[in-house]
């Protein structure tokens, strides 16, 4: 029996990772207000890892309730610098401010992936990467944002390491798939255990 897989994301990057791994799936967007889910979590002292996991779980459960019998993959990623959490920048000025704030420091990417079926969580996982950014001057940041354009608005931190964003870093500790927002190896192992893919 083949299990239907659904990715609860319209992210072209996450879709490409699964397609490149030879996984057959469909996509569906979750109907949740991420900021409304996050707010009480931060007030109660949740860690950035907790927030990523809870958001991934909310997405997976929402989509699984609309796709009976399917195994749904929910994902989320948070960027934290100390106690501060960053979101995708809403405009180029916000992207510039984010880069200035994380320049010369080590921030953390927390990537969560959750599997759900029929409104119930089957499995959850969080991977962490530590990203040390070079000291960037304002001129370089401006040129970088000018070169990458709207790509700066599509990722938390205003960068993508799979493109020119890699030039922003002096050191990276963590799995590539964690950095791009989908901890693929643990996910594939769990999909095999759940008999969703051949293994």
Curated annotation (Swiss-Prot):
<dbReference type="InterPro" id="IPR029001">
    <property type="entry name" value="ITPase-like_fam"/>
</dbReference>
<comment type="similarity">
    <text>Belongs to the Maf family. YceF subfamily.</text>
</comment>
<dbReference type="Pfam" id="PF02545">
    <property type="entry name" value="Maf"/>
</dbReference>
<dbReference type="GO" id="GO:0047429">
    <property type="term" value="F:nucleoside triphosphate diphosphatase activity"/>
</dbReference>
<keyword id="KW-0378">Hydrolase</keyword>
<dbReference type="InterPro" id="IPR003697">
    <property type="entry name" value="Maf-like"/>
</dbReference>
<keyword id="KW-0963">Cytoplasm</keyword>
<dbReference type="GO" id="GO:0005737">
    <property type="term" value="C:cytoplasm"/>
</dbReference>
<feature type="active site" description="Proton acceptor">
    <location>
        <position position="76"/>
    </location>
</feature>
<comment type="function">
    <text>Nucleoside triphosphate pyrophosphatase that hydrolyzes 7-methyl-GTP (m(7)GTP). May have a dual role in cell division arrest and in preventing the incorporation of modified nucleotides into cellular nucleic acids.</text>
</comment>
<protein>
    <recommendedName>
        <fullName>7-methyl-GTP pyrophosphatase</fullName>
        <ecNumber>3.6.1.-</ecNumber>
    </recommendedName>
</protein>
<dbReference type="GO" id="GO:0009117">
    <property type="term" value="P:nucleotide metabolic process"/>
</dbReference>
<feature type="site" description="Important for substrate specificity">
    <location>
        <position position="77"/>
    </location>
</feature>
<feature type="site" description="Important for substrate specificity">
    <location>
        <position position="13"/>
    </location>
</feature>
<keyword id="KW-0546">Nucleotide metabolism</keyword>
<feature type="site" description="Important for substrate specificity">
    <location>
        <position position="162"/>
    </location>
</feature>
């Amino acid at each position: 029996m083949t299990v239907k897989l659904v990715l609860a994301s319209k992210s072209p990057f996450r879709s490409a990772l699964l397609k490149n791994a030879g996984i057959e799936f469909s996509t569906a967007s979750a109907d949740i207000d991420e900021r409304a889910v996050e707010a009480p979590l931060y007030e109660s002292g949740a860690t950035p890892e907790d927030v990523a996991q809870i958001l991934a779980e909310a997405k997976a459960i929402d989509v699984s309730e609309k796709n009976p019998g399917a195994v749904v993959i929910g994902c989320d990623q948070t960027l934290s610098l100390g106690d501060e959490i960053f979101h995708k920048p809403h405009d180029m000025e916000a992207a510039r401010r984010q880069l200035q704030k994380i320049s010369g420091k080590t921030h953390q990417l927390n990537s969560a992936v959750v599997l759900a079926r029929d409104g119930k969580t089957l499995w959850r996982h969080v991977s962490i990467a530590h990203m040390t950014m070079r000291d960037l001057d304002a001129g370089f940041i401006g040129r970088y944002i000018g070169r990458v354009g709207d790509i700066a608005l599509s990722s938390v931190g205003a960068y993508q390491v799979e493109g020119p964003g890699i030039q922003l870093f002096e050191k990276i500790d963590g799995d590539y798939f964690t950095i791009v927002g989908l901890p693929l190896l643990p996910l594939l192992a769990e999909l095999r255990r759940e008999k969703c893919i051949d293994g």
